[in-house]
A protein has these predicted regions:
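Hydrophobic beta-strand-centered segment that forms part of the acyl-chain substrate-binding groove
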Residues: 50, 60-106
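A generic structural signal for short beta-strands and their flanking turns/coil linkers
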Residues: 10-14, 22, 79-87, 101, ...
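Noncatalytic linker/hinge segments flanking ATPase motor cores
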Residues: 28, 52-60, 142-152
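HotDog/MaoC-like acyl-thioester-processing domains
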Residues: 1-11, 94-153
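Catalytic strand-loop segment that frames the active site of acyl-thioester-processing enzymes
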Residues: 1-53
């Protein structure tokens, strides 16, 4: 059987918690000045228990999880890596400060693309808290094994 950089059904996850200091720091770093991310009083007046995270924060963490996972070698030590080619993220509920959030991806398909010297992986993912789904996502990645001789065109 040919060695593959991933398998359909492969899942990976990470639990994170965004603190009340982390949320405004990230929002400022991406120039998101919405006061719901910076001002407790404004967030409470809007009906939230406190600060809510910028969508870019939890979305970027979910996307980064794919990069981290596929940069890890296979169980037999074979190096692998990948690049994100596209992500579609749908926000379902706000992310509150200081709640546990489970980020999860599952590979749904893998197709060899000789022109790109790799495989196109399709993934489905989400972020959940005890309140339910916070966001859902799909992703398309280019994966490869070993070291690349040249960057894909």
């Amino acid at each position: 059987m040919a060695k593959l950089p991933a398998r359909a059904g492969e899942s990976f996850a990470l639990r994170v918690r965004l603190g009340a200091a982390e949320i405004p720091a990230f929002a400022l770093s991406v120039h998101d000045h919405n006061p719901l991310h910076h001002d407790q009083a404004v967030a409470r007046a809007a009906g939230y228990p406190g600060l809510i995270a910028s969508g870019t924060q939890i979305g970027s963490m979910l996307m980064a999880l794919t990069a981290t996972h596929f940069a890890q070698p296979l169980e037999d030590g074979t190096p692998r890596n990948g690049l994100g080619m596209g992500f579609d993220i749908r926000f379902r509920a706000v992310v509150l400060a200081d709640e546990d959030i489970d980020l999860r991806w599952t590979v749904t398909s893998l197709e060899r693309k000789d022109r790109l010297d790799g495989w196109i992986a399709q993934l489905e993912g989400d972020a959940r808290s005890q309140r339910g789904v916070l966001l859902s996502a799909t992703g398309t990645l280019l994966l490869w094994l070993g070291q690349r001789a040249a960057a894909p065109a």
